[in-house]
């Protein structure tokens, strides 16, 4: 699966997803840190990637209508520690096949 990991998530998630044979690019590794959401979104869609983020700006399903993109996963936790974020991302990929969702998911 092709994934773009936003800058607000630990790089460890990328490492663990790559170990599961996912094609992961990160905002940090691509030099997009600090860029506007529109730039991150455009890069993600141009590359055909699901965007994984904590940024609530991407959770608006009116702006990001299901079926019009490759997918968005917005991870929201009460306690968003590094360890908890990694655990949630791992759980998502352990329990769901998010390829082809084309929807916004707050998880």
Language model: regions and residue ranges:
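Solvent-exposed interaction patches of small proteins and small membrane subunits
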Residues: 20-22, 39, 63, 72, ...
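C-terminal structural segments of small proteins and small subunits
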Residues: 69-107
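Short beta->alpha connector loops at strand-helix junctions that form conserved
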Residues: 28, 55, 75-77
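Glycine-rich nucleotide phosphate-binding loop and flanking beta-alpha elements
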Residues: 11, 58-60, 81
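N-terminal first-folded block
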Residues: 2-50
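Short, hinge-like loop/turn segments at secondary-structure boundaries
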Residues: 42-44, 68-71
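Acidic, metal-binding active-site segment of PIN/NYN-like and related structure-specific nucleases
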Residues: 45-63
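Short glycine-/acidic-enriched loop or helix-start segments at secondary-structure transitions
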Residues: 14-15, 61-63, 84
């Amino acid at each position: 699966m092709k994934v773009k990991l936003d800058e607000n998530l630990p790089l460890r998630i990328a490492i663990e997803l790559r170990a599961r044979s996912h094609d992961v690019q990160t905002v940090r590794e691509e030099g997009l840190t600090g860029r506007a959401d529109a730039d991150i979104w455009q890069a993600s869609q141009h590359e055909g990637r699901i965007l994984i983020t904590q940024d609530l700006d991407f959770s608006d399903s009116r702006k990001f209508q299901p079926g019009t993109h490759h997918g968005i996963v917005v991870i929201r936790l009460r306690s968003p520690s590094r360890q908890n974020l990694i655990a949630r991302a791992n759980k998502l990929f352990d329990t769901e096949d998010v390829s082809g969702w084309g929807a916004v998911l707050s998880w």
